[in-house]
């Protein structure tokens, strides 16, 4: 379950930000997670609650913003939305696609005190 490792990294990032920006508590975390990032959101929520215990983010609200997956279609030469990596191009039916959006995870913002 790599979601626990993601939560550990998130905790470290928040602790570093707290030292650099002089805050002591995080009350809300907004994460943007791409459809192709390979993150199970429910497992991430569970891991977040466990990993944040005893930290500056204990009890913080986790808000997940799900980003659409997109890919470049080499057959019709454009970026198209995809529900899964295995879907054909919704415009031309082509299968020569390379994901170019919705592949990552980003901390959008933190609500702090």
Swiss-Prot record:
Superkingdom, taxonomy of origin: Bacteria
> What keywords were assigned to this record?
Metal-binding, Nickel, Zinc
Pfam families, per the entry: HypA
Which GO MF term does the entry hold, naming one?
zinc ion binding
* Sequence positions that bind Ni(2+): 2
Q: Does the keyword ATP-binding apply?
A: no
Respond yes or no to whether keyword Membrane is given for this record: no
One GO biological process term is:
protein modification process
Q: Show the InterPro entries listed in the entry.
A: HypA/HybF
Binding positions (Zn(2+))? 73, 76, 89, 92
HAMAP family per the UniProt record, alphabetical = HypA_HybF
Q: Which family does it belong to?
A: Belongs to the HypA/HybF family.
Q: Which PANTHER family match?
A: HYDROGENASE MATURATION FACTOR HYPA
What is the stated purpose of this protein? Involved in the maturation of [NiFe] hydrogenases. Required for nickel insertion into the metal center of the hydrogenase.
Matching NCBIfam families: hypA (TIGR00100)
Q: What is this protein called?
A: Hydrogenase maturation factor HypA
